[in-house]
């Protein structure tokens, strides 16, 4: 069943069920649950994914685990892509399929196929900052219109997808955050400042939220 049809009592206890399994990231969990609740309440545009979230923080603080637990508690699948495997220009073809006449045309696109097969899921794109810049054009399309057309003209529908992208962009700077500004810059603010340097404004502007994870 789509998350929009989840009964309210299950959603009401969602925060606590996630916190039971994730320690020390209460603020991050709150933001994620809030995004799901907004989708449930019909407060988002029908032609967009349920949520488009960027998780930032150092390695090993639970970014991927929150996505896993969220999917499990919502009773939907987790579809994961490691974006460090999509660093080359031709990586776009892997996600949406190669053009006619090219090797791999018959294979279709890995992302479009996955969403057509599992249209109701948490889509996790790990280490998004490593993806080739052309892949961001695909993501803008997904965040804007909740659909993607593959190489054969078939559409994948992202309206019941919670899109979560993880990044450790800025984590290394955050540890130096107390330098300067008389120590007033929080590590979270330092990470968010680095996010602005790492990602294009049109990408950041389309996110439902940027969620900071602390170590």
Label each PLM-derived region with a short phrase.
Residues 1-215:
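AAA+ P-loop NTPase nucleotide-binding core of proteostasis motors
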């Amino acid at each position: 069943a789509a998350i929009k049809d989840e009964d309210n009592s299950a959603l009401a206890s969602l925060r606590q069920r996630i916190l039971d399994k994730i320690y020390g990231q209460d603020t991050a969990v709150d933001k994620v649950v809030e995004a799901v609740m907004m989708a449930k309440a019909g407060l988002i545009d029908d032609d967009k994914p349920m949520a488009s979230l960027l998780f930032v923080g150092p390695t090993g603080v639970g970014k991927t685990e929150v996505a896993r637990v969220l999917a499990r508690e919502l009773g939907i699948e987790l579809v994961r892509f490691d974006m460090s495997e999509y660093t080359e220009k031709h990586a776009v073809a892997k996600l949406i399929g190669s053009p006619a006449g090219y090797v791999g045309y018959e294979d279709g696109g890995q992302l479009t196929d996955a969403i057509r097969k599992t249209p109701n899921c948490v889509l996790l794109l790990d280490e998004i900052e490593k993806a080739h810049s052309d892949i961001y054009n695909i993501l803008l399309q997904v965040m804007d219109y909740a659909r993607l057309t593959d190489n054969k003209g078939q559409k994948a529908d992202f309206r019941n997808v919670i899109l979560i992208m993880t990044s450790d962009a800025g984590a290394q700077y955050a540890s130096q955050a107390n330098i300067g500004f008389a120590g007033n810059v929080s590590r979270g603010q330092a990470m968010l400042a680095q996010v602005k340097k790492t990602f294009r404004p049109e990408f950041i502007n389309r996110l439902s939220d940027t969620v900071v994870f602390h170590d």
